[in-house]
Design a protein with these regions (language model features):
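Short acidic-hydrophobic, aromatic-tinged amphipathic segments that line or gate anion-handling sites
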Residues: 64-68, 122, 221-224
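Short, hinge-like loop/turn segments at secondary-structure boundaries
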Residues: 58-62, 139-142, 218-223
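Glycine-rich phosphate/diphosphate-binding loop of Rossmann-like nucleotide-binding domains
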Residues: 14-49, 162-231
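Short, basic, helix/turn surface patches
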Residues: 66-77, 145-158, 227-231
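Glycine/serine-rich phosphate-binding loop and adjoining beta1-alpha1 elements at the start
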Residues: 2-10, 15-16, 84-177
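An N-terminal-biased, well-structured beta-alpha scaffold segment characteristic
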Residues: 2-113, 117
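Short, acidic/turn-prone active-site loops that include or flank metal/cofactor-
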Residues: 70, 103-106, 126-128, 207, ...
Length: 231
C-alpha cells in the first residue's frame, strides 16, 4: 500500500460512550484511504466492536490499536459519532480538533466549553448540504435516512398484523394504513420503506411544497388546508 513517508496528521477515535450507540466514527476502509494520504490513525481497542469491526480489521487497514490514554495524548484530531462529554474534553490537549455531531444548533454552552478548553470544534451538522463536493460528508442526510428506515422497520415489527394485503384460501387481510408525520429526509425514507413493505401510506408535513415529494413515492399527502411555511 503506497503511503507518504511521514504522517502529517494523527487522527484518533475512541469508544463511544452513549448507551446503545453502535456506530463508530472511523471504519477500516476509510483508514486505508487516510493512510494513503499520510494520516496516522489511532483506534482505541474495541472501538469498532459494536459495528462488527474487530481490532484486527483496523490493524490490517493500517491503523494503530492503542489505549484511550494513548489516543488522547497523541491525536491532533479526534472523531466522534456522539459528542464527547465535558469530562473528556478536559482531558484532551489544547489545539486538538474535535470532529463530530456537536449539537451546535441547540447547545451554545457546549460550544463555549470547547472554546474554553482551547479546542477546535468541527460541527458536522453544520456542513452545507448544497455543496456537491461535500455531500459524501453530509451526516444529516445519511443518518436521518437510517433513522427513517429504522422507524418503519420498528413500526412494522411492533404492529400486530401484516403490512401488505394478503389473500389466502382462508380469506383476505387488508393492508395496514400508515401515517407518517414529517416529510423531511427521515420521513421520506420511512415513506418509501413502508410502501415497499406493502402498507397504504399517508404522510403530512407543515410544508405544502413537500406534497410533490410525498406523492412521488406513491403515498397520499394529508392536506389540512393550513400553511405554516410563513411562520
Amino acid at each position: 500500500m503506497a503511503e507518504k513517508a511521514e504522517a502529517t496528521v494523527v487522527f484518533g477515535v475512541l469508544n463511544e460512550t452513549s448507551e446503545h450507540e453502535s456506530r463508530v466514527a472511523l471504519t477500516p476502509d476509510i483508514v486505508t484511504r487516510l493512510r494513503k494520504s499520510g494520516v496516522t490513525c489511532l483506534i482505541e481497542s474495541g472501538a469498532g466492536v459494536a459495528s462488527h469491526y474487530v481490532d484486527e480489521d483496523y490493524t490490517k487497514a493500517g491503523a494503530q490499536v492503542v489505549s484511550a490514554d494513548d489516543v488522547i495524548a497523541r491525536a491532533d484530531a479526534l472523531g466522534f459519532v456522539d459528542r464527547p462529554s465535558n469530562e473528556l474534553l478536559a482531558r484532551v490537549k489544547q489545539g486538538t480538533w474535535i470532529i463530530g455531531m456537536l449539537g451546535s444548533f441547540t447547545d451554545a454552552d457546549y460550544v463555549a466549553a470547547i472554546e474554553k478548553a482551547g479546542l477546535v470544534g468541527v460541527a458536522m451538522e453544520k456542513l452545507p448540504r448544497q455543496l456537491s463536493s461535500a455531500q459524501s460528508m453530509d451526516e444529516m442526510t445519511s443518518q436521518n435516512s437510517v433513522m427513517g428506515y429504522k422507524a418503519a422497520i420498528v413500526a412494522a415489527n411492533a404492529y400486530g398484523s401484516f403490512l401488505p394485503m394478503m389473500t389466502t384460501a382462508a380469506g383476505t387481510i387488508r393492508p395496514a394504513k400508515v401515517l407518517i408525520l414529517g416529510a423531511g429526509i427521515a420521513g421520506l425514507q420511512a415513506i418509501g420503506t413502508a410502501k415497499r413493505l406493502g402498507a397504504v401510506v399517508t404522510a403530512y408535513d407543515v410544508r405544502p411544497a413537500s406534497k410533490g415529494e410525498v406523492e412521488s413515492l406513491g403515498a397520499k399527502f394529508l392536506d389540512l388546508g393550513l400553511d405554516f411555511s410563513k411562520g
